[in-house]
Amino acid sequence: MLLSNVAVNRTVVHTQLVSGSRSALHALSRTSHSVPVTHTHQRRHIFSHKRRLSSSTLAIPFALSNTNSATTAPLQFLSNVSLCRVTPGTITTSAKATAPNLDKMSAEAATTAAQASASPVEDSFLKKAVSCQSETEREAVMAARAAKKALRETKETWWAPYVALTKPRLTVLVVLSAMSSYALTPEAVSLTNLLFLTVGTALCSGSANAINMGREPAYDSMMTRTRGRPVVRGAVTPNQAFTFAGITGTVGTAALYFGVNPTVAILGASNIALYGGLYTTLKRKHIINTWVGAVVGAIPPLMGWAASGGSLLHPGAWCLAGLLYAWQFPHFNALSYSIRDEYKKAGYVMTAWKNPGLNARVGLRYALLMFPLCVGLSYYNVTDWWFVLDSSVLNAWMAWWAFKFWQQENVNIALAAAGKQYSQNPFARKLFWGSVVHLPGVLLLAMIHKKGQWDWLFGPSEDEKKKTLSS
């Protein structure tokens, strides 16, 4: 608390400090003389500027005791966290420490720090001034920093590399395609089935991706796109990646088997084998690897359809699978074109550099195939006929960029044959990002237009009424 009957002179020294803030403060006190104190102000106190002491600006509020009075009261120093007391004595400061001269005073103090000497009282005060936090608060701050650092190190060295092994963004896309198909099935659905389908599909996808990374660190290190993967960086070893893949694959398949049904479990296990085994091997053998990879992408919709007990012989299930299969080509062919030189350097046999014309032509061909596949979903009563209309907008958008990509590639091939220079195909990137938006958009529209979705609001269609009457 502040002591009464102590005459003080309210003085605030606002000193601009850099890393040597303590030295500047010491120099400030050593190069000054005593300031006389009057008795006109009683019970005055000043609170410190609410700013971290580590900042380049430090405000030092302090009160001066009356050294001329018979009774010398202890100096009171009040900060925003604690009250620091200094033993009686003469605390000195510059007689010219007025507001306009503060910056000049701090500069002069810093230059004369090595030539000055200070009394124990002055030194004690300044030490208190620059470290006026309580011990409890300092310990709490240090403990919080240590905990945050430990959490960050734990994340970087323990679970983050294993999450990266699963290729989270790709896994999310795989899970969403399975969930969308599950939502579109005409059979009854349940929350429990959906939960097991989601977890099991995610674990199976993560297992396949971990096997893929564990087998290719030497080649992934040659590509900018893949050199940051955990096995390449040494965050996990290939054996650890394979162990992780074995655990997640086993748990994922078991979740699908016991929580959904054996058909879905078989499809999940086959996807691990196709992606982690056949596709990864073919990447360095033949361009057919892209078609095998597309089959891998087509399996999750079949898993979602079968999860509700729907028959895999239903044409609607294969329209959904075909949708995912066809989408792979404009998406991946545009992606691989942009980094075709890196694929070639790493030894991956991709159509983008083996046969650029075929690469662009295949991308356009399968982009156009999206139109009849969406019509098929309506024809086989998976969606209503309005889906054909609005899905055609997204299909036309992606098909347009696929066409421009193919057209420009033909021009580039002609220029190369004539021995002329040509620039990078600018439509590859546009097609890639167009495909990223296209697939979620089409799946969302399909769920909105699911057959019978809006019968509660608009009533059943004429076809549904005829079916009801005939039955």
UniProtKB/Swiss-Prot annotation:
Catalytic activity: heme b + (2E,6E)-farnesyl diphosphate + H2O = Fe(II)-heme o + diphosphate
Record's keyword terms, sorted: Heme biosynthesis, Membrane, Mitochondrion, Transferase, Transit peptide, Transmembrane, Transmembrane helix
InterPro entries: Protohaem_IX_farnesylTrfase, Protohaem_IX_farnesylTrfase_mt, UbiA_prenyltransferase, UbiA_prenylTrfase_CS, UbiA_sf
Organelle targeting sequence: 1-60
Gene3D superfamilies: UbiA prenyltransferase
Biological process terms in GO annotation: heme A biosynthetic process
Subcellular location: Mitochondrion membrane
Membrane topology recorded in Swiss-Prot or TrEMBL: Multi-pass membrane protein
Coiled-coil residue spans: none
UniProt entry tagged with the keyword Nucleus: no
Chain's role: Converts protoheme IX and farnesyl diphosphate to heme O.
UniProt protein name: Protoheme IX farnesyltransferase, mitochondrial
Organism encoding this protein: Yarrowia lipolytica (strain CLIB 122 / E 150) (Yeast)
